Curated annotation (Swiss-Prot):
One of its GO terms (biological process) is defense response to bacterium. InterPro entries: Elafin-like_sf (IPR036645), WAP_dom (IPR008197). This is Waprin-Lio1. It comes from Erythrolamprus poecilogyrus (Water snake). Damages membranes of susceptible bacteria. Has no hemolytic activity. Not toxic to mice. Does not inhibit the proteinases elastase and cathepsin G. It comes from the Eukaryota. One of its GO terms (molecular function) is peptidase inhibitor activity. Residues 9-59 form the WAP domain. The keyword Disulfide bond applies.
Length: 60
């Protein structure tokens, strides 16, 4: 068991796309990230409209 370990919280600039309107790329119904740190540069960990989190291109 590892004690005292933490995951660094990374918050990338920009915002997530709006999921109120169905958008096909957001329809991936599985979790692919937990925080922005799990995503490539320029992408954020966002709600995908299915109740899960996926990496999406940040909106500015």
């Amino acid at each position: 068991m590892l004690l005292g370990t933490t995951s660094a919280q990374v918050v990338r600039p920009g915002s997530c796309p709006n999921v109120d309107v169905p958008i096909p790329p957001l329809g991936l119904c599985r979790t692919t990230c937990q925080t922005d740190a799990n995503c490539q540069e320029g992408r954020k960990c966002c709600k995908n409209g299915c109740g899960f989190m996926t990496c999406e291109t940040a909106r500015f």
